[in-house]
Curated annotation (Swiss-Prot):
It is found in: Cytoplasm; Cell membrane. Residues 11-18 are annotated as: G1. An essential GTPase that binds both GDP and GTP, with rapid nucleotide exchange. Plays a role in 16S rRNA processing and 30S ribosomal subunit biogenesis and possibly also in cell cycle regulation and energy metabolism. Residues 37-41 are annotated as: G2. Keywords: Cell membrane, Cytoplasm, GTP-binding, Membrane, Nucleotide-binding, Ribosome biogenesis, RNA-binding, rRNA-binding. One of its GO terms (cellular component) is cytosol. This is GTPase Era. Residues 120-123 are annotated as: G4. The gene is era. Residues 202-279 form the KH type-2 domain.
Length: 295
């Protein structure tokens, strides 16, 4: 019996959704950073095994939006709930339920699909706090079909979670070819890798005002990639921070990004990144559409 279906991973920003998917796939497909709201599009990740095919939808963290980009991110997350077979609600061991989690759970109460509670980062918290968190969530929202404490970064209980997901999947066909692991284009993933390096290396006030626009991506006569990208920011002061003294920060971002892009593309890469100011781009519908936020 072959099973298949779609699974949404949903939760507050920065609870480890992308880390979980990257762990399951053993591929760097979703941007991972310690800063919240790093995932902006619902990346579809496809896991095909002998007895099943699971299509994971990695959503932006749900939150109350502050600008048009934020509204887009929340809309994408809400749309991801429609037409899926299982919802994985992910949180971290904080004891009491926070307002952000309650905001999401009140929406999940209304859906018919099975919802799993995934408590991540158990390796970073003591067992008492983990147990308290599990009890408080179960008591407040008894609709969870399964409750699984995990560590996505340390690979703890991830296999158990995977087996439980298979248990709830319906019989179905292979929706995608066996060798396909994502529906995202290479250009999108390359842009996300560059943005991830900026998120990791830059100070707190800059990253969420950053986007990466792919200008050109082509192979040269040697079969190596030549990539030109522009990093957009909202202020002149941010541009100076991104470039750094004598171009040192931009060089570091580009160097780290190139290393990961070469691993992803399995090819030598020549990467050039420029920085451009587009004031308040996160509230400009035209720019958002140009960058692919079309929801």
């Amino acid at each position: 019996m072959f099973k298949s279906g779609f699974i949404t991973v949903i939760g507050r920003p920065n609870v480890g959704k992308s880390t979980l998917l990257n762990n399951i796939m053993k591929e760097k497909l979703s941007i991972v950073s310690h800063k919240p709201q790093t995932t902006r599009n619902n990346i579809q990740t496809i896991l095909t095994q002998e007895d099943c095919q699971i299509v994971f939808v990695d959503t932006p963290g749900m939150h109350k939006p502050k600008h048009k980009l934020g509204e887009y991110m929340v809309k994408v997350a809400e749309e991801a709930l429609k037409g899926v077979d299982i919802v994985l609600f992910m949180t971290t061991p904080e004891g009491q339920l926070g307002r952000g989690d309650v905001y999401i759970l009140e929406q999940l109460k209304r859906i018919k699909q099975p919802v799993f509670l995934i408590v991540n980062k158990i390796d970073e918290n003591d067992q008492g706090k983990v147990a308290e968190t599990l009890k408080n969530y179960h008591d407040a929202y008894p609709f969870f079909k399964e409750i699984i404490p995990i560590s996505a970064s340390k690979d703890k209980n991830v296999d158990t979670l995977l087996e439980l997901m298979k248990k709830y999947l319906p019989e179905g066909p292979k929706y995608y070819p066996e060798d396909m692991i994502t529906d995202q284009q290479e250009r999108f993933i390359v842009a996300e890798i560059i943005r991830e390096k900026a998120l990791r290396l830059l100070s707190e006030e800059v990253p969420h005002g950053i986007a990466v626009e792919m200008m050109t991506m082509k192979k040269n006569e040697k079969g190596n990639y030549e990539i030109n990208a522009t990093m957009l920011c909202e202020r002149d002061s941010h541009k100076g921070i991104i470039i750094g003294k004598n171009g040192s920060m931009l060089k570091k971002i580009s160097q780290y990004a190139r290393q990961d892009i070469e691993k992803f593309l399995q090819s030598k890469v020549s990467l050039k990144v420029w920085v451009k100011v587009k004031k308040e781009w996160r509230d400009d519908n035209r720019i958002l559409k140009e960058l692919g936020y079309r929801q």
